[in-house]
Every structure is written in structure tokens, then in C-alpha cells.
A protein has these predicted regions:
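NAD(P)+-binding Rossmann beta1-loop-alpha1 motif at the extreme N-terminus of oxidoreductases
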Residues: 1-62, 87, 124-126, 288
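Helical "substrate-binding/catalytic lid" subdomain
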Residues: 134, 144, 165-293
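Anion (oxyanion) recognition and catalysis
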Residues: 20, 40, 102, 109, ...
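Hydrophobic residues within alpha-helices
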Residues: 15-19, 80, 104
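General beta-strand structural signal in soluble alpha/beta enzymes
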Residues: 47-48, 91-92, 114-118, 157-162, ...
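Rossmann-fold dinucleotide-binding core
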Residues: 76, 97-186, 192
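Rossmann-like NAD(P)-binding element
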Residues: 31, 44-103, 109, 127-136
Length: 301
């Protein structure tokens, strides 16, 4: 397929490259020129503007947005509405709030422009391993763009979740679970680190990957973290929250579903900004490993 990609950050740039490797044609646009030039070297078709990107696509046109949630998504949709026509498709692959996705889909309906919300997991490793995709929208439209999902995802790694908003809802809960998992691992390593024994956290995170009931990809990343910096002394225990954890807690409250672990892990991140905690340093380091998220180092203070 031929697709437009707007937003060439850590995720958008790698997704563009994976699509190119899968023999898709990708027209790219970004607010700054550097990432466009970099993508063009790998075979992408550069665009000078959103209008230029749309002009270079065949009908029905498919445009993937990989920009930060909130205003950037709305701004790009407003710009795209000037040029897209009935049955053209906008895919929002960012971490948008699911209710915003519902509103955006509704606002596009009068023009006949189709909207697909797609939760994307895989972080900086997605180029090599593939991205887990959770998407929602009109079923016929989603079936039409399935070749894109098939290329981006590993085998069995993409799922049609339901109508507009459902993809980002599933991704929201996915990230809420991630909050709880990271918190549990980090607290465990903090208990190990503070024990009377001289324990090798790298070796422990390694052995737990073989046959243990707690084995996971996160432990593989933990092994990398502790190999590079066994004490995490250079890190501040400051952990950002990206929004989805908060939204998951809010959804749980609205739906009268108790979610104490996810709630506690969110509060722990907020509290991390005023504490010196080994567990919070561990979470910060792990988030950097899987998502390329920024870490705050003591030298930055």
C-alpha cells in the first residue's frame, strides 16, 4: 500500500522504516526537516507540507498520525480535513485518550472521512521485533488498511477491538497494567538491594527468565539495566507518568471497578518526585530501555 506518515519521532520514524522494509510506499512529513531527510535516505517519499503529502497519495488516501496526544492530533486532523475526501482514512497511532478518539471519529463522519484509533506498543524495539497493535473503527475500513497492520506487527500481534475508541481504550488499560507490573518488579528489586546479602541483581533478573513464573521481557530489560549500572546511583528516582495510567484509574472509578494496584503504582510515580527510592530508579531505567523515555540523572539537577 501507499500511506502517508505524519510525525517522525522515535516511534514514527521506526514505523516508517518497518513499512518500507515491508515493501509499502510511505510519504512522510514532519515539523522539522531532519527526520524527513533521514526517512528519504531509507526510501520514503518526502513531503513539503500536509497538503503535499495528501497530493502524493492515491485514492482512497490513508494517513497515519504519529504525533503526541491532545492538541497536535486535533491540529493535524483540522489540516487534513481541508484536503481529504469521502472514504479517505486517518489513523491515529498515538496515545490518545479513547473518548477523544470517539469525538474525533464523530466529527469526521459528516465529511465521510474514516477514522481508526490504533494503540501501539513496542517502543524503541518495535522496528526489529514488531509492534503490538490494538485498533478500533469501522470494520470495513479496518479490513482495508489491514496490510499496514500486518507489516507493522509480529505474527498474531494485531487485533481489531471494535468501534471507534476501542483501540485506544484497550491500549490505555495495557499501559495501566504496565504501571502495576513495573511497580511490582521495582519494589522486589528494592527489597533485594536493601538486604543483608550482597546480591547480584543482574544475575537474579537473568535467572528469573528461565522457568520462573515471573519471567517476562521486562526482566530481560532489567538484566540490561543492572549490567550497565548495578547501583543506579547516577539516576534520580523521578518517574514521569504519560497519562494512560491516570486514565485507567479514572475509567476504573467511573465503572466501579476496584483497581488498587494500578492506582497505587500511579501514586508511587507522583510520590517519586519527592523521594530517593531505588524502586523508582529501577522503573525510570526500565522505561528508558523499552520506550526510550527520558530519565532524570543527578547531573541534570
Amino acid at each position: 500500500m501507499k500511506i502517508g506518515m505524519i510525525g517522525l519521532g522515535k516511534m514514527g520514524g521506526n514505523m516508517t522504516e518497518r513499512l518500507l522494509r515491508g515493501k509499502h510506499e510511505v510519504v512522510v512529513y514532519n515539523l522539522t526537516q531532519g527526520p524527513i531527510d533521514e526517512a528519504a535516505k531509507k526510501g520514503a517519499i518526502p513531503a513539503k507540507s500536509v497538503a503535499d503529502l495528501v497530493r502524493k497519495l492515491p485514492k482512497p488516501k490513508v494517513v497515519w498520525l504519529m504525533v503526541p496526544a491532545g492538541k497536535p492530533v486535533d491540529q493535524n486532523i483540522r489540516e487534513l480535513k481541508k484536503y481529504l475526501k469521502k472514504n479517505d482514512v486517518i489513523i491515529d497511532g498515538g496515545n490518545s485518550e479513547w473518548q477523544d478518539s470517539q469525538k474525533r471519529a464523530k466529527s469526521l463522519k459528516p465529511s465521510g472521512i474514516k477514522f481508526v484509533d490504533c494503540g501501539v506498543s513496542g517502543g524503541v524495539w518495535g522496528l526489529k521485533e514488531g509492534y503490538c497493535l490494538m485498533y478500533g473503527g469501522d470494520k470495513k475500513t479496518c479490513d482495508y488498511v489491514e496490510p499496514i497492520f500486518k507489516t507493522l506487527a509480529p505474527k498474531k500481534g494485531y487485533l481489531y477491538c471494535g468501534p471507534e475508541g476501542s483501540g485506544h481504550y484497550v491500549k490505555m488499560v495495557h499501559n495501566g497494567i504496565e504501571y502495576g507490573m513495573l511497580q511490582a518488579y521495582a519494589e522486589g528489586f528494592a527489597v533485594l538491594e536493601s538486604s543483608e546479602f550482597d546480591l547480584d541483581l543482574r544475575a537474579i533478573s537473568s535467572v528469573w527468565q528461565y522457568g520462573s513464573v515471573v519471567r517476562s521481557w521486562i526482566l530481560e530489560l532489567a538484566e540490561r539495566v543492572f549490567k550497565e549500572d548495578p547501583t543506579l546511583d547516577d539516576l534520580d528516582p523521578y518517574v514521569w507518568d504519560s497519562g494512560e495510567g491516570r486514565w485507567t484509574v479514572e475509567a476504573a472509578m467511573r465503572q466501579n471497578v476496584p483497581a488498587p494496584i494500578i492506582t497505587a503504582s500511579l501514586l508511587a510515580r507522583i510520590a517519586s518526585r519527592d523521594t530517593d527510592s531505588f524502586s523508582m530508579k529501577t522503573i525510570a531505567a526500565l522505561r528508558n530501555q523499552f520506550g526510550g523515555h527520558a530519565v532524570k540523572k543527578k547531573a541534570d539537577d
